[in-house]
Every structure is written in structure tokens, then in C-alpha cells.
């Protein structure tokens, strides 16, 4: 996270004057960025729920939510309160441990993914050298939670839903990783911050979506499948499997699956923004994020720093929510594919395309001086 040294020194002096121990300040200084990010993700989930309901209503020529606050903006809060008030039921013949741990295995990896997602230069919880691989590795754990939840329910529909989730994840995780491998050589790094910085030279035309158009399309399709969104929501197909792995769940555990679904969609949109859409960089160079020294401003001025950070976050979120709008609109316009079509698309189409796209990129980078 961005840390202002003057502010840090002022806070330390204030803590000493109030008589608080130094360890308490260190704990608060570490936990504050995490809580801030968690609050931001929570607000992002609420916005996604509202957008999804409104976009689906527009596609189907309905009004959508309008009673839960102005224009229905607190519909997510109403849904959460409803789920909290419902009874939490555990199947008598199911495995209670696996049944309880399944939703946790789904939710935790999604929130861990936000550790390596930057919203601006320095606005990141953990700038790892293997940031994009960390995101792929963590996101691949969630389907194991779905499989665990389905198996622990001791229900044939739940078990089939969990097996479908595992098969779907394996089919699309490899093309997704190959798409990331195609982007990484362009910046000579696996760090998410370095990948964004490598796209900052030429504005709109410097984005990786122009240098990797095939990879961008493959990444978009694979991310939809990873998020289990229509037309790839086969693990929870209501017409075939009642509700898939969610069949036996109720109350807060049922809500945890939706708590994981919407942040996962936001994570995929932010990842697409970072890898292919230039991240926090403006489409037009120096228009919205000017160099402060060129304007005669002091680059250490706190006001200028706050303005730069705010604009970077706005640009990143604008790109992410534009990508997210396409994902939501796709859900309500395309029909669900069959299981064999899903696997054929992953293994016979996306995998060869992603592999063929990564080989020329790697060869060019190795041959270039």
C-alpha cells in the first residue's frame, strides 16, 4: 500500500504521546490496509449485485429492484439479511465436516486473490514477483471447495455438481495460465505492477489487448468459465441438477457461495484490466495522470499525491466494471452449453489456441536482443 512517511511519523509521535506501546501501532499499521481493501471489496460486491439485477432487468425489459433504497442500491444488504435470518441445516447423512468446510474453501481463495491486484502504482497489499501465478494458483483451489461441498452433502445432484465444477476448472485453468504466460514475456515479469507499467508508454495503443488479441479473447472466455457464469454455469444448472453443489445448503452457508461468486467475477475483471487493458494507465498519455513536475507542482505535495491515487483508482475501476458489464450482459443473452460442448471448447479449441498464441510470443522474446 502507499505509505506517506510524514504521516507515519506523525502517527508514531501521537501514539507515543498517548502512551500506547509500539507493538500496537505496528499491528494497526498492518491491519488498516487489509481492512480498507476488505471494505472496498464489500462495496464492490454490492455494486455488482445491483448492476447484475439492473442489467438483467434491462435485457428482459423489467424494472428490477427499486424498493430496497433509492433505485434498489441496497438490494445486496437486503439479500444478506434474508440469508442470515434463515435456518442453517446440515444433512443428517452427510459429512458435517466436509459440508461445513466446503463454503470456506470457496470463499477464502477468492479474497486471497486481491493480495496481488493493484488499483494504482503502489496501491497493492503484496507486490509479489510471481503475482499472476499466485492469482492462478489460489483461484484453482476454489473448485476443490465445490467438490468438497458436493461430496459432503451426500446428495447425487450435489455430487454431480461438484464433479462438474472440478472438470470445468481443469479444462479452463490451463488455457488461462497459457494466456498469462503469453503476457508475462512482454513485460519480462510475473509481477502485476510490472505488467501494468510495461503498458504505460503509448496510452491506448500500448495495451496488451492489441499485442495479444487472441490471448485476450481466450482469457475472456476462460475467465467466464472459471467464474462459472452463463453459458458455463453447468455445475449449478437448475434444470438438470436442482442447484448443483448448493442443493443441500441454506442460510449463511448458502450465501457464502454467492459471496464467493461475485468477488470472483470482480477479480477476473480486475485481472483482465491489469493484464490487457493497461491497469491504472490513462488511455491518452499524460491526460489524466500528468507528471506533476512538468506542471510545476511539487511531486511530494500530499494533495497532488492524493489526486493521482484517486484518479488511478477511478481509471482502474472504470475499466474493470466495463469488462464486468460485458460478462453480465453475456450471462443474460447466451444459452447454456452442454457438458460435452463445454469440455470440447476447453480442450479442443481454447487449449490449442492459447498454446499456439504463447509459442510465437516466447520465441520472439527469446530471439530479441
From Swiss-Prot:
Topology class, membrane: Multi-pass membrane protein
GO biological process: aerobic respiration; photosynthesis, light reaction
UniProt subcellular location: Plastid, Chloroplast thylakoid membrane
Keywords: Chloroplast, Membrane, NAD, NADP, Plastid, Plastoquinone, Quinone, Thylakoid, Translocase, Transmembrane, Transmembrane helix
The keyword Mitochondrion appears for this protein: no
InterPro entries: NADH_UbQ_OxRdtase_su1/FPO, NADH_UbQ_OxRdtase_su1_CS
Principal cellular location given in the protein's record: plastid
Gene Ontology MF terms in the entry: NADH dehydrogenase activity; oxidoreductase activity, acting on NAD(P)H, quinone or similar compound as acceptor; quinone binding
EC number: 7.1.1.-
Transmembrane segments annotated in the record for this chain: 25-45, 104-124, 130-150, 270-290, 306-326
Enzyme class (EC, first level): translocase
Pfam families referenced in this protein's UniProt entry, alphabetically: NADHdh
Catalytic activity: a plastoquinone + NADH + (n+1) H(+)(in) = a plastoquinol + NAD(+) + n H(+)(out); a plastoquinone + NADPH + (n+1) H(+)(in) = a plastoquinol + NADP(+) + n H(+)(out)
CC per GO annotation: chloroplast thylakoid membrane
Family note: Belongs to the complex I subunit 1 family.
Known partners and oligomeric status: NDH is composed of at least 16 different subunits, 5 of which are encoded in the nucleus.
Primary role: NDH shuttles electrons from NAD(P)H:plastoquinone, via FMN and iron-sulfur (Fe-S) centers, to quinones in the photosynthetic chain and possibly in a chloroplast respiratory chain. The immediate electron acceptor for the enzyme in this species is believed to be plastoquinone. Couples the redox reaction to proton translocation, and thus conserves the redox energy in a proton gradient.
HAMAP family named among the record's database cross-references: NDH1_NuoH (MF_01350)
Protein's name according to its UniProt entry: NAD(P)H-quinone oxidoreductase subunit 1, chloroplastic
Amino acid at each position: 500500500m502507499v505509505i506517506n512517511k510524514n504521516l507515519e511519523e506523525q502517527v508514531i509521535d501521537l501514539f507515543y504521546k498517548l502512551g500506547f506501546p509500539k507493538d500496537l501501532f505496528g499491528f494497526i499499521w498492518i491491519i488498516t490496509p487489509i481492512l480498507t481493501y476488505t471494505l472496498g471489496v464489500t462495496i464492490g460486491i454490492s455494486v455488482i449485485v445491483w448492476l447484475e439485477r439492473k442489467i438483467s432487468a434491462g435485457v428482459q425489459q423489467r424494472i428490477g429492484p427499486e424498493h430496497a433504497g433509492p433505485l434498489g442500491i441496497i438490494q445486496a444488504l437486503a439479500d444478506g439479511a434474508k440469508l442470515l435470518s434463515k435456518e442453517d441445516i446440515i444433512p443428517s447423512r452427510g459429512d458435517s465436516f466436509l459440508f461445513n468446510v466446503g463454503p470456506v474453501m470457496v470463499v477464502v481463495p477468492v479474497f486471497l486473490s486481491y493480495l496481488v491486484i493493484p488499483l494504482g502504482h503502489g496501491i497493492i497489499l503484496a507486490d509479489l514477483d510471481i503475482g499472476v501465478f499466485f492469482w492462478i494458483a489460489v483461484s484453482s483451489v476454489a473448485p476443490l471447495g465445490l467438490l468438497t461441498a458436493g461430496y459432503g452433502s451426500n446428495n447425487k445432484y450435489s455430487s454431480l455438481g461438484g464433479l462438474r465444477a472440478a472438470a470445468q476448472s481443469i479444462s479452463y485453468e490451463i488455457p488461462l495460465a497459457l494466456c498469462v504466460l503469453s503476457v508475462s514475456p512482454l513485460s519480462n515479469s510475473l509481477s502485476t505492477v510490472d505488467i501494468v507499467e510495461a503498458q504505460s508508454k503509448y496510452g491506448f495503443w500500448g495495451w496488451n489487448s492489441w499485442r495479444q488479441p487472441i490471448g485476450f479473447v481466450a482469457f475472456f472466455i476462460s475467465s467466464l468459465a472459471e467464474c462459472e457464469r452463463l453459458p458455463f454455469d453447468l455445475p449449478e444448472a437448475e434444470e438438470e441438477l436442482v442447484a448443483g453443489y448448493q442443493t443441500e445448503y441454506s442460510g449463511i452457508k448458502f450465501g457464502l457461495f454467492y459471496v464467493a461468486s461475485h468477488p470472483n467475477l470482480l477479480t477476473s475483471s480486475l485481472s483482465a484490466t491489469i493484464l490487457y487493458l493497461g491497469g491504472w494507465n490513462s488511455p491518452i498519455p499524460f491526460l489524466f495522470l500528468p507528471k506533476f513536475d512538468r506542471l510545476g507542482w511539487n511531486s511530494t505535495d500530499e494533495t497532488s499525491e492524493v489526486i493521482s491515487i484517486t484518479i488511478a483508482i477511478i481509471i482502474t475501476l472504470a475499466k474493470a466494471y466495463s469488462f464486468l458489464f460485458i460478462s453480465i450482459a453475456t450471462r443474460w443473452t447466451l444459452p447454456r452449453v452442454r457438458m460435452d460442448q463445454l469440455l470440447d471448447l476447453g480442450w479442443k479449441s481454447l487449449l490449442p489456441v492459447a498454446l499456439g498464441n504463447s509459442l510465437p510470443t516466447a520465441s520472439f522474446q527469446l530471439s530479441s536482443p
